[in-house]
């Protein structure tokens, strides 16, 4: 049975190393991590910052999504994921996920599935602010 060691929606900085340490397991032959970073350009425009807002149910939705992916996994020891909300600057992590598994294929596959599931179904909204003074909402679910 796969352990869910973190499923957090937070306004505090998140770090891959912390998630990797959480999922570390003596029986795991692989740990795979993912960091979704705030980049400095989008659509050819310079990005100043992003602001993530979330539906009131988002923390529970995230917990449910991580548990769902964990339950579907095979050969996976532990998973952890966190998503930021609030104001994020270029270079900060918006989404962090880590998976410990018996073998690399399960670790890579489960981590990719976890990230894609969160991106597709978590009710968060991204508001981008650009260097040219414009802004836009992106990726509403």
Swiss-Prot record:
Q: Does the keyword Membrane apply?
A: no
Q: Name one GO cellular component term.
A: cytosol
| Binding of substrate, residues | 37-39, 103-104, 119, 126-128
**Biological process GO annotation list?**
Mo-molybdopterin cofactor biosynthetic process
Q: Which reaction does it catalyse?
A: 2 [molybdopterin-synthase sulfur-carrier protein]-C-terminal-Gly-aminoethanethioate + cyclic pyranopterin phosphate + H2O = molybdopterin + 2 [molybdopterin-synthase sulfur-carrier protein]-C-terminal Gly-Gly + 2 H(+)
Main EC class the enzyme belongs to: transferase
The EC number of this protein is 2.8.1.12
Which pathway does it take part in?
Answer: Cofactor biosynthesis; molybdopterin biosynthesis
Domain of life, per UniProt, equals: Bacteria
GO MF entries: molybdopterin synthase activity
InterPro entries per the UniProt record, alphabetical? MoaE_sf (IPR036563), Mopterin_biosynth_MoaE (IPR003448)
Keyword annotations of the record: Molybdenum cofactor biosynthesis, Transferase
Q: Which SUPFAM superfamilies match?
A: Molybdopterin synthase subunit MoaE
Q: Which residues form the signal peptide?
A: none
Query: Transferase among the record's keywords?
Result: yes
User: What does the annotation say about its assembly with partners?
Assistant: Heterotetramer of 2 MoaD subunits and 2 MoaE subunits. Also stable as homodimer. The enzyme changes between these two forms during catalysis.
Sum up the protein's function in the record's words: Converts molybdopterin precursor Z into molybdopterin. This requires the incorporation of two sulfur atoms into precursor Z to generate a dithiolene group. The sulfur is provided by MoaD.
Q: Which family does it belong to?
A: Belongs to the MoaE family.
Protein name in the entry: Molybdopterin synthase catalytic subunit 2
Give the originating organism: Mycobacterium tuberculosis (strain ATCC 25618 / H37Rv)
Which lineage?
Answer: Bacteria, Bacillati, Actinomycetota, Actinomycetes, Mycobacteriales
The gene name reads moaE2
